């Protein structure tokens, strides 16, 4: 497993980890072990001492009254990919965070508000249409909200080329209404 610490207010409060094998290999292995009663490999293993719905991965990168825009993604690898591909390491105005899944909680919203964030870009995976809509409705009363519309629903941020990521942020940032209309038209 590759292990990542979860840091909140400068303190390590937990960890998330992901197996180094690709999902397909884990699934193949687990299908074989199912009948033998052997150990099943988990793709993700997280610490259990914290409620992850109250935390944001990379939250300490959001600077109080300095970070105007936050890109909200699902997981750790999304944040790493966005930070690397958009070169956000030393950018005080934009940061990427993860909600550890496809939901955003009231506590996570409050954390972003408390740092003075004004704009949130929802960067959930392309296959998470309903989750994006729900998150947008939850965020809209507090922030200016945009959705990063990933054209290929089967790809995550780490699978997209740098030029594709820049293209999404240059040409495919949609308002909540534009996103909903687009998804209705695609049906």
Locate the predicted segments by residue:
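Phosphate-handling DNA/RNA-contact segment within nucleic-acid enzymes
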Residues: 1-115
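Acidic beta-strand-to-loop metal/phosphate-binding motif
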Residues: 72, 118-131
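Short hydrophobic alpha-helical runs that function as membrane-insertion/retention elements
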Residues: 95-98, 119-123, 146
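Short, acidic/turn-prone active-site loops that include or flank metal/cofactor-
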Residues: 99-104, 124-128, 150-152
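A charged alpha-helical hairpin associated with nucleic-acid processing machineries
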Residues: 144-151, 167-187
């Amino acid at each position: 497993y590759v292990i990542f610490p979860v840091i909140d207010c400068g303190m390590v409060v937990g960890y998330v980890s992901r197996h180094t094998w690709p999902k397909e290999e884990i699934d193949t292995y687990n299908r074989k072990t199912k009948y033998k009663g052997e150990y099943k490999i988990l793709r993700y293993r997280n610490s259990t001492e914290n409620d992850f719905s109250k935390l944001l991965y990379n939250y300490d990168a959001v600077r109080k009254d300095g970070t105007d825009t936050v890109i909200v993604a699902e997981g750790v690898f999304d944040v790493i990919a966005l930070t690397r591909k958009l070169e956000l390491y030393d950018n005080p105005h934009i940061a990427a965070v993860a909600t550890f899944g496809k939901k955003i909680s009231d506590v996570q919203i409050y954390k972003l508000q408390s740092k003075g964030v004004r704009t949130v870009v929802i960067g959930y995976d392309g296959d998470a249409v309903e989750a994006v809509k729900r998150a947008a409705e939850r965020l809209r009363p507090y922030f200016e909200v945009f959705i990063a519309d990933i054209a290929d629903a089967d790809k995550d941020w780490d699978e997209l080329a740098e030029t594709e990521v820049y293209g999404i942020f240059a040409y495919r940032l949609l308002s909540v209404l534009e996103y909903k209309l687009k998804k209705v038209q695609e049906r």
